[in-house]
């Protein structure tokens, strides 16, 4: 009964913080990056700051002081009558200058939310919400083809995109016997990416001053998946620990539901 109250309390606290976190993650962290022009955008290094400092490595890590969202088997290491809660942040500072102008872009955002609570001895429940990818770009190009300039006029192309995809993990880790644990995470992928493309034509000969073509594409991602994980301690003492960890994530096809609209204005 006590574990049930503990789980309900943790879920209640989680529901209170989720709207704020989702709102914060609706802005692209890697804004104005040309690498986010196609597909899902810039893929995020997985794990909390503790694991990201190692390039996302850590499927074999198991410690009651840190939640390891990379391997659900590690959830079994949580101590009884305790719990772990972590909120991470991320900040980008971009500066660019030329001989005539300079610009800067700064953003601060909540990056991930992790929660780990014990359900029974050797059994832990974990929740993670973390970004999977970010999209943010703004590109403006001017047509330089002499043939188009002579027959159509001055043409300017504008491309603007923003959005992200987020993954939610709910999982259990169980330690059935000494030195071995396994676990499973159920993942829900969700994201919205908006891409705008505009073409502005200024004729050279025609009496029409300007013609504009506005286009918008909205991509919605919604898919589920799983992660299976296992860990085995070969040996452990007060000074050393050697653990083998493996994970398996079946392939998930993240195809978006896309809606596109194009409006011409003369």
Set out the residue ranges of the language-model regions.
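A general structural signal for short secondary-structure junctions and capping/turn motifs
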Residues: 2, 75-77, 115, 220, ...
